[in-house]
Amino acid sequence: DGKYTFTMPDSKVTITPTFSKIEDTKPSKTGFNDVASSAWYADAVQYVTDKGLMNGTDDNQFSPNASTTRGMLMTVLARYAGEDTTGGATWYEKSMEWAKAKGVSDGTNPNADITREQLVTMMYRYAGSPKADGKLDSFSDAASVSSYAVNAMQWAVASGIVNGSNGKLNPQNNATRAQVAAILMRFCEMSK
């Protein structure tokens, strides 16, 4: 709390305080205060930040449990493709134009949170819509995958990009930044 108690002895005393800077301590190699080394997504966060695909939400925070927007994913994929994402009237404008031109996204709703099935669909399109031969029937919520996303989800499952959680794909759930980092890392490793 920054308070100190001093009891004056009976004789004359000289006190000389010494102050030293304490370096910021980071709980993980990522450099983000909110990403513990033991977190299931720590390696993925390190990977995507090292590759310049994702940044922190500020200098010390990654915000792993925050939602990811469609514009964020368009930007990440454009960066992965080597595109310059700087400039434009908005931070995502150049990425959105790239995503539309490449058929990755229709460019709508860039500020909307992205669902897991939308995430996988954009990545599937980025990959060139490869053959989708994965089975979804082992997931209890497979029927909740939207028809437009079925092939993409089958591909993502077969490729090991998406593992699901507790036997569910959660396709309608918003994708957190940690989930996006993990899926991106798997995608990049698969694409090598």
Residue ranges and their predicted role:
Residues N151-S159:
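Short glycine/proline-rich, acidic loop/turn segments that cap or connect secondary-structure elements
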Residues K21-A42, N55-E117, M123-A149, V162-N174, ...:
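Feature responds to low-complexity, polar/acidic, surface-exposed segments characteristic
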Residues G2-P27, V76, M122, A152, ...:
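Conserved "repeat-terminator" motif of extracellular CCP/Sushi domains
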Residues A175-T176, I183:
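Disulfide-stabilized extracellular recognition modules
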Residues P17, V48, A99, Y126-A127, ...:
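Proline/glycine-anchored alpha-helix kink/cap motifs
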